[in-house]
Amino acid sequence: MTQSAGLRFRQALANSKPLQIVGTTNAYFALMAEQTGFQALYLSGAGVANASYGLPDLGMTSMNDVLIDAGRITSATQLPLLVDIDTGWGGAFNIARTIKEFEKIGVAAVHMEDQVSQKRCGHRPNKAVVSTEEMVDRIKAAVDARTDPNFVIMARTDAVAVEGLEAGIERAKAYIAAGADMIFAEALTELDQYRHFKAQVKAPILANMTEFGQTQLFNKEELAQAGADMVLYPLGTFRAANQAALKVMQALMNDGHQRNVLDTMQTRADLYKYLGYHAFEDKLDQLFSQDK
């Protein structure tokens, strides 16, 4: 019997200290991540907004927008995928539908946050959070909707930056009591904060190592020692690809050719390697042999 995606995520977590989860904004990035040795993948809501729609991460994308990108990734790889579902896209029935739709396409885990529906990036100022009671209701709706008990429902709290560390911890405890499996503690700034969080919250904890944000870029050993069970790198690959693409565009505009920026590009041979291109070619040769 095929293991569910949620079970594969839980097994990856059990086998890794900590589990490194890399952001993949498209299916090809997912293939590269798999062949590099990662055991879990991530689809960022900001990544969908920025890469697929050219929009800022301000709650402007819909469930279907994210579902499309997630489905492309789960179709390309068997690695378990964690997906950012923002605030769940509505009330209890909307959240229930969200869970069912993502479960249906083979997503392993989702994280849902306690920001207000007009959300902001977790590392930007002026965030606002809903009451603990409202977030508990969101979690209960999500837990009730899943059909696979191994499908992971992770609660993200943005409250530390708004209400302080202790308030964030108390919220996390309430979220676990409501049925959340794991906690995404957003925008912590010190290793001691992770230690304190882990000591108080009896559940797996995710640390978000996003670049150019509020959190120092600790290494995985430091985070593991501080109690983090998962380390997320949500948009590093996207940012790197953007910068490389910009250099190529500038070279084309300024120099009229790309010869001086070839070293920033992936070679055709490497592209074909990650795609498994030659296996597809061999299959074509078998199906449409010239010897027929």
From Swiss-Prot:
EC number: 4.1.3.30
CDD domains given in the database record: ICL_PEPM
Annotated catalysed reactions: (2S,3R)-3-hydroxybutane-1,2,3-tricarboxylate = pyruvate + succinate
Residues that bind substrate: 44-46, 121-122, 156, 186, 208-210, 239, 268
Sections of the chain in a coiled coil: none
List of residues binding Mg(2+): 84, 86
Record flagged with keyword Disulfide bond: no
A GO molecular function held by the record: magnesium ion binding
Family statement: Belongs to the isocitrate lyase/PEP mutase superfamily. Methylisocitrate lyase family.
Subunit structure: Homotetramer; dimer of dimers.
Protein name: 2-methylisocitrate lyase
Species, as recorded: Shewanella oneidensis (strain ATCC 700550 / JCM 31522 / CIP 106686 / LMG 19005 / NCIMB 14063 / MR-1)
Gene: prpB
